[in-house]
Amino acid sequence: MMGPMSTREPTIEIDARRFWSTVMRSGQIGPGKAGGLRRLALTDADKEMRDLFVTWCTEAGCTITVDRVGNIFARRPGRDDHLPPVLMGSHLDTQVAGGKYDGIVGVLAGLEVLRTLDARRVATKRPLELVCWTNEEGARFTPPMVASGAFASVFDVDWVLALRDDDGKVFGSELERIGYDGKTAVGGRGIDAYFELHIEQGPILDREAVPVGIVVGGYATRGMHVDVHGETAHAGPTPMDRRRNALVGAAMLAVAVNEVGWNYHATEGKATVARMVAWPNKAGILSEYAQLTCDVRHAEREVADRMWAEVKAAMPECARRANVEMRIAGEWQFGSERFDPGCIRLIREAAEQLKVPHRDILSQAGHDAYYISRIAPTAMIFTPCRDGISHNEAEHAELDYTVPGVNVLLHSVLSRANR
């Protein structure tokens, strides 16, 4: 390999056609019903995409390792291979009715960086690693971002491996079934820095026609599963005052959560119930059990904490009115982190060097970068998506508005890896 190219050299750029053809190829694996993707974690479609990703990375000169929760690491050696690596990454799994770009663009942007360096025979002082995090979406195994969370010691590895989907299938068993039950330890190793490129999943960059968002941090997010316990009974003869319908209790709490969101709407607060299940969930019978998943989000951590307290305060009254029992089955929080100033500076310098219009921005969605920021200097780059639509098969991104961000990623990583 040649020596490291100066990161001030403006001529090195990615191969835009190669990058976009890779994104389009990914968009053929796990097709949805309306033009998007349904590629849930650890399904056959996920395996097909993972296998192709590994092939691409190997062809770019990388060595592959897989850890116990299925995270894939593609390593490109550095001139001093004993130094901690600079990481890039995101995820390849999607929502049930997801788009072709969420997470995927970030992983394949990292791949294009590796391909570009390989084609140009550019060596870096530090090794580079591209990571595909498992089950970022949490669409099949909840909560989201469990594998990056395990890597950052937020979640216990054995707890992650024991998670079950709605059909009772076990995370660890599904990893084994698709051949990605790796043997490498999860986390516990040195990282110089982590960079993640991602579509914004909001309307700001698209509305302002700005191709690069420099993510300085994220909305504080608080989430939980709530179990509701009642009693089965006949829907006909059972008097209203004797009913213990778990589904009604869950529905009351769902309305209360939504009201908290509206109460903070003026300051861009959000409260959501995104999932609800009930058993037996049949006509003519009251539900004995229900579970809902909810969260609150706000740019200010103190306000998010206040919103969360209001949600929890609503639980006893909802339980009393429905004559049921409620308990919190699990909680999580993320997003109140602020990203590393040094990594942010490198992104800003790269954007200015390449004359790419950019602006600072906060992330309002959850990302693997949040958990990695707890153990390593981290920053994110946002690129636009049309009308801010995401977690929807209509999600769309344009080549011309995505490539500038990938070039900024390339130069940011080069700068960091050559320190």
Q: Where are the language model's segments positioned?
A:
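A short beta-alpha structural unit
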Residues: 39-42, 272-281, 293-300, 325-344, ...
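Acidic, glycine-rich active-site loops and adjacent beta-strand->loop/helix elements
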Residues: 92-94, 128-139, 201, 232, ...
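Flexible, glycine/charged-enriched surface loops at secondary-structure junctions
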Residues: 65-67, 123-127, 182-187, 237, ...
